[in-house]
Curated annotation (Swiss-Prot):
Family indicated by similarity: Belongs to the pyridoxal phosphate-binding protein YggS/PROSC family.
Organism: Mus musculus (Mouse)
UniProt GO molecular function: pyridoxal phosphate binding
Residues bearing PTM N6-(pyridoxal phosphate)lysine: 47
Gene it is expressed from: Plpbp
Protein name: Pyridoxal phosphate homeostasis protein
Described function: Pyridoxal 5'-phosphate (PLP)-binding protein, which may be involved in intracellular homeostatic regulation of pyridoxal 5'-phosphate (PLP), the active form of vitamin B6.
In-chain residues carrying the UniProt-annotated modification N6-succinyllysine: 125
Keyword Phosphoprotein part of the UniProt annotation: yes
Length: 274
């Protein structure tokens, strides 16, 4: 069974993808029957990795990729080799987004989803920017929740969730609300029971759906990374963000400079576990 980035480097991206997809299906089989029967989406997180590795993963059937930094995503998604070799590619932005970077993000070719809306003001800015682009369909967005309560992580307070989702649905016609996203605390000991941060997101979804009259199966849950994606799927995740297990460990010495407008929180590799 594939566990670490070192094996990925030795055996290749195709082998790693097959192994991850097998583990995804094993986890789906262990999921309680009372959860929505939604096939989890695998987001291959390619941050710090070259275009050739994205193309290799695409060649092995992967279609959805994620990036944490706006500039890196824009450069990678605009790469001529990726544009020509990966016509069906879909990009998710999964990092912290500041309002001054919104227009740059909206210019990303094949942008499919923004997973990290964390305020009404950001939602309004994204809605306006996407509207000006003149798209044929709304941009899919998730609302990010800080379920762990850690200062080092971005996201709404759980108590703010319903109000922000209501605002998006009522006042942002160029956005399509599709789910909730969280990072959660790292290193939870599963012998102590399910990750409480994941459980908190499930509870929030139930409360949200009851309050707004939304069918549960229409609200995705993005939770789980390389170190905990199987547990996340077992408890209900429909979108897992996996990087090093597919592409190998990252060399941060070669990572592109962070967006100049990134704040102190964003400069910390919060989602290094992808």
């Amino acid at each position: 069974m594939l566990r670490g980035g070192s094996m990925t480097a030795e055996l290749g991206v195709g082998f790693a993808l097959r192994a991850v997809n097998e583990r995804v299906q094993q986890s789906v089989a262990r999921r309680p029957r009372d959860l929505p029967a939604i096939q989890p989406r695998l987001v291959a997180v390619s941050k710090t990795k070259p275009a050739d590795m994205v193309i290799e993963a695409y060649g092995h059937g992967q279609r959805t990729f994620g990036e944490n930094y706006v500039q890196e995503l824009l450069e990678k998604a605009s790469n001529p080799k990726i544009l020509s070799s990966c016509p069906e590619i879909k990009w998710h932005f999964i990092g912290h987004l500041q309002k001054q970077n919104v227009n740059k993000l909206m210019a990303v070719p094949n942008l499919s989803m923004l997973e990290t809306v964390d305020s009404v003001k950001l939602a309004d800015k994204v809605n306006s920017s996407w509207q000006k682009k003149g798209p044929t369909e709304p941009l899919k967005v998730m609302v990010q929740i800080n379920t762990s309560g850690e200062d080092s992580k971005h996201g709404l307070l759980p108590s703010e969730t319903i109000a922000v989702v209501e605002h998006i649905k009522a006042s942002c016609p160029s956005l399509e609300f599709v789910g909730l996203m969280t990072i959660g605390s790292f290193g939870h000991d599963l012998s102590q029971g399910p990750n409480p941060d994941f459980q908190r997101l499930l509870t929030l979804r139930r409360e949200l759906c009851e309050k707004l009259g939304i069918p549960v199966e229409q609200v995705e849950l993005s939770m789980g990374m390389s170190m905990d994606f199987q547990h996340a799927i077992e408890v209900g995740s429909t979108n897992v963000r996996i990087g090093s297990t597919i592409f190998g460990e990252r060399d941060y010495s070669k990572k592109p400079a962070l967006d100049k407008t990134a704040d102190a929180k964003a400069s910390v590799p919060l989602v290094q576990g992808h």
